[in-house]
Amino acid sequence: MAEPSFARLFLLFFSFLLIFATYSWVFGPDSGFLFGTRVRKTLGSNRQVHVDHSLEKPHHPLDPLTVREINRVRTILSNHDPGFGSGSATIHSMALDEPEKSRVVQWKKGNKLLSRRAAVVAYWGGQTHEITVDLDSGRVVSDVINRTSGYPILTLNDVFAASQVPLKSLEFNRSIEARGVKFSDLACITPFAGWFGSEEEGRRVIRVQCFTLQGTTNYFMRPLEGLYVTVDLDKLEVIKIIDKGPIPIPKASGTEYRFGVQNKPVHMDRINPISMEQPDGPSFRVEDGHLVKWANWVFHVKADQRAGMIISQATVRDSETGEPRSVMYKGFPSELFVPYMDPEEGWYYKGYMDAGELGLGPTAMPLVPLNDCPRNSYYIDGVFASPDGKPIVQPNMICLFERYAGDISWRHSEILFANADIRESRPKVTLVARMATSVGNYDYIFDWEFQTDGLIRVTVAASGMLMVKGTPYDNVDDLGDREDDAGPLISENVIGVVHDHFITFHLDMDIDGPMNNSLVKVHLEKQRVPTGKSPRKSYLKVKKYIAKTEKDAQIKLSLYDPYEFHIVNPNRKSRVGNPAGYRIVPGGNAASLLDHDDPPQIRGAFTNNQIWVTPYNRSEQYAGGVLIYQSQGDDTLQVWSDRDRSIENKDIVLWYTLGFHHVPCQEDYPVMPTVAASFELKPANFFESNPILGSAPFFEKDLPVCRPFASS
């Protein structure tokens, strides 16, 4: 057999293409870039200025590392260990080592900036190093080997290098030829390894699955089913190849998703472009790149390699006094768990931990103005470190915009009194902070939405394409009693594999301060009415219980045993004596149905409950643990919570998992409609009355003149 050199060149090109699509690599001043960073072009906003990241300085204790700081960390690390200079040491993450929470809370604008440190996770010599770099002194203050199970977050270099390894194997190349696939059409991706026992312990491994690009960009719909490769990530060599023989490759026809190459007739009337106009400009402002001020809200927002986007120090102005009052110190998606429901070879290991295994930041593509974000949006870049420690930029990774969709925040008309003509209504205008990440076939859109009544709504929307399985069958009638357990047939030779999505959020609630918060479980209990006392037979009574320890706060939601869950500050009372609080309001949700001793569920044990409360611990940030790749579940939220520490009247963290089961159908093929799930953080006796009374209605005179009618 001839050496498939063209295929290797193609995969190399394909890998670099993905790198350039993901990262904003830059090479010189002529391109408008400097020091490996990008000068952002203004998109979607007339008031947004260009940002030269090479000149940025931190202004707030929680501001992310700047380009200058990342370059300085790289220099310090090179002096600390020759591995960083030679390239044998790989940086898997570099982020701000946030100052102690108490110091951040006390800091005020105008004060001297707190000490800046960088937290680095690096890998070399088969060991994971957690390194702290003091930027003020220019030295490494700690270098500790993490000996827990698991490995650090993958780099895209890991992923792209592993995808090329199978081409070194003669057996693999023969399998590709046997399937009639040209090497020039080959596209290989790297589903993560999971953890399934001793065979894979002691070395970093990854799976490789291949598809064909022939006839479509949507290669996810054309899997080379039955061919599975396991690769040693450190040695970059094939460990195992499983070839079950050729299975029919699904057709390319009808799978292309790019708008410019669609050739099918569209049987719907065209929708005219829609835009929300703001003649006076947006109502929010962004100070120093990260501090957002809008209506009665102030919060800090930044991009993060692992979490994607972090909201910090969210405060809302009191509607009676104007006092800024703290609501949440820090909120972010801590982990995404996506287990697939196919126990067969080639699929059983697919139980992704997207945040901890690959990161939501590096996979966040630039948001598309007018389609991802509306007019008058403000864009924020992400600044991260590459595996060799050089700064890189994810342009337009986060957008901020005001949303008005014709919704009503409050209304009332009075009709009971003669001569009364009372019609009061307030439009619902909200502020949204958004980011989107493309993790393989799935895209996730994260929205943090702030309302003037003090409510925060968090929404996660899933989009993109399914991960499908090839099958010999092209009609359900051919299956007979052999219906595939993995999922339904959604197109010829295509099984939509059943799977779950679980997103666990870290919500460090600070209701009127970081200390003295408690969880109150508000139980709705059915009461029987004594015979003869009333025509009614039953009613609901509210009973409140304060959670004393962590196990009191391990909560499974139930429609038939309803609770509300309030985080309160018992030391801050309203004028009628109620403790100030916020409650978490779950939306539609789903629970994991996997056995607790199933390896994916051991690692994803943070989904065993929908709500948890733990005492604040700055080392407990990630629900699946710091090192989650091939981890064994020994450092999860479940493990921490089982210590059963006290949580009453303390600085506490609320954890909430939203989820949904996904049984695919034909409408999910070849691309999926966006599906969203959400929850709310809602004031509960926090204000003396509804702040919405202070919002103003819209008037025609304040708006631009537009054509107000549609054709009849």
Swiss-Prot record:
Q: Which cysteines are joined by disulfide bonds?
A: C188-C210, C373-C399
List localization entries. Secreted, Extracellular space, Apoplast
Arranged from A to Z, the UniProt key words for this protein are:
Abscisic acid signaling pathway, Apoplast, Copper, Disulfide bond, Glycoprotein, Metal-binding, Oxidoreductase, Secreted, Signal, TPQ
Which reaction does this enzyme catalyse, per its entry? a primary methyl amine + O2 + H2O = an aldehyde + H2O2 + NH4(+)
- Where in the body, by tissue, does this protein show up? Mostly expressed in roots, stems and flowers, and, at lower levels, in leaves and cotyledons.
GO-annotated molecular function: aliphatic amine oxidase activity; copper ion binding; primary methylamine oxidase activity; quinone binding
The induction comment states:
Induced transiently by auxin (IAA). Strongly induced by salicylic acid (SA), and, to a lower extent, by jasmonic acid (MeJA) and flagellin 22 (fgl22). Triggered by abcisic acid (ABA). Induced during wounding, dehydration recovery, and treatment with putrescine (Put).
Annotated positions of the 2',4',5'-topaquinone modification: Y442
Annotated GO biological processes are: abscisic acid-activated signaling pathway; nitric oxide biosynthetic process; putrescine catabolic process; response to abscisic acid; response to auxin; response to jasmonic acid; response to molecule of bacterial origin; response to putrescine
EC code: 1.4.3.21
Family (UniProt):
Belongs to the copper/topaquinone oxidase family.
Name used for this protein in its record: Amine oxidase [copper-containing] gamma 1
What's the source species for this entry? Answer: Arabidopsis thaliana (Mouse-ear cress)
